[in-house]
Each structure stands twice: as structure tokens, then as C-alpha cells.
């Protein structure tokens, strides 16, 4: 019997970077929750964006946000991974100094920070994803201690842009995962959607065999592997 369903969002339930979801999904999810099934939104998005997207049923869901670095109910954070300052600030400086065609931002459990409020990335996150994103004068020097994720952005080929320099430099210090064509998510080591699902399973006493997951991209692979039933959508990357 399935007790936990977890799904990715962008590329799985909605078109990347949009806030339009089929109303029928809301009806189905509500029916599943009424049957006692835990429904988890498992996305690279931040909490506020997930809440806006699922507004009609926002208080009935479990939230796995920022690529698996945070697990929370509507009321409280159950689990959070943070990243060492030297790691995220070092990645930030590399992007800003050596990758001129890319942009970047950092995430806390509740909001994001980026340098240029007029940039394409900033506007897309704020206006299309519904993010709470704030401008920082010098991103690498912000005082925030609870950084949970660093993300590189390129308008069409982020994975390829990161391959020559960024990925080799940081692949052993962070958990890297491409998220669509535009993003490279960098999580604390050991933090991904799969470890978040494992936490949820242990927290609620649910086995992998009682878990069903849906995804489409490389950052969904660990989540799909930790479920007795896992499904890649038709448009998923071949590796998935």
C-alpha cells in the first residue's frame, strides 16, 4: 500500500519556470491526502514558490525544498542541511570572476540572494518562479550563516558552461546536479532529493516499498531510486 507520494515540479508537473499547474492535479492530490497518503512536493524551488504553486492545497502538503536540503511541514522545519561558508563563497567568486556568461544565487531556507536585481535570472526567479529573492551588494560576503544551496545560472547551457572549470573544482566538495538547461544546483554534501526522501520515510515510519515518486531530471535520480515505485515522465532526460 502506498503511504508516501513525492513528485518533482519543473518538467514533471509544470513547464520549467512557470506557475501554471493543471487544476486536475489539485483535485487528485487532495483526494490522496484525504485517504491518508502523505503527498510531498520535492523540488529545487524554495518553500514560498512551492506554496504559491499549490495554493489551493498548500496546508495539506509536505515540502521538500531547494533540491532536498530542507524538509518542512507548513508549520515547521523538520530537517535542514547547510553549506560551509568557504564552499559557497568560493563557488560564488569563481562564477563571478571566471565565468562571465553565467550568473548565480544563494539560498537560505526562506529566501534567496543575488547581486543584480536587473538581471535576467533575478527577474525570472522573482516573476516566473514566484521567489522571494533579494539583492545583495557583494554576494560572496553576505552575513547569512544558513546557506543551504548555491546555484549557477546560464540562459541555455548551464551544464556545458560548468563542465570545463566549475564542475571539476567543486564536484568533491558539494553535491552537483543539473536542473534543466539553465541551472546547476550545488547542495551540501549528502543533501539531495534522495536523502530527503529517506529522512521522510524514517520520520513517518514508511518503507521504500510504500513510496511512489515522479521525476524528469538528473537531480531526481536519487529520489526515484529510493522508492518501490518510481516513474520518469515522457519528457525526462535519457539518463533518468
Predicted features and spans:
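Short active-site oxyanion
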Residues: 36-40, 59-61, 149, 209-211, ...
